[in-house]
Amino acid sequence: MRILCLDIGSRRIGVAISDPLKIAAQPFCVLDLQKEDLYSCLDKIFNEHQIEKIVIGYPVSKFHPDKATEKLQKIDEICSELERRYKVGIIKWDERFSTKAVERILREENVSWQKRKKVVDKLAAVYILQGYLDFINS
């Protein structure tokens, strides 16, 4: 059984998946919501992999952690639909600074802007999922 992670953005969703032992997170793909249907893509992932849980990158505001933003409401709606559709546990995991951390690492490694743009979403999902895996394994 594996754990799936979604880093939900307004246009793209970064996807990462754990190894079967739930030790390491691996980049999986980036879903372009302007070109692809989220649930069709997830149906394929669920058919090909044994997913037991979904970790959702949850963007809690560092200044107003109790404030429900429009983005949080959208993510909450997606979480409800995922739970209903796939009958798996949903974990909302703090994703603050995940994209910034990944972008900084890629810049330090001199990865070009064009290449960063292609991988940053799925690597942010890896960053989020690895944080969760480290937590459950500690």
Curated annotation (Swiss-Prot):
GO terms for cellular component: cytosol. The keyword Transport does not apply. Keywords: Cytoplasm, Hydrolase, Nuclease, Ribosome biogenesis. It comes from the Bacteria. Its main location: cytoplasm. Its EC number is 3.1.-.-. GO terms for molecular function: nuclease activity. It is found in: Cytoplasm. Gene3D superfamilies: YqgF/RNase H-like domain (3.30.420.140). Signal peptide: none annotated. One of its GO terms (biological process) is rRNA 5'-end processing. Belongs to the YqgF nuclease family. Could be a nuclease involved in processing of the 5'-end of pre-16S rRNA. This is Putative pre-16S rRNA nuclease.
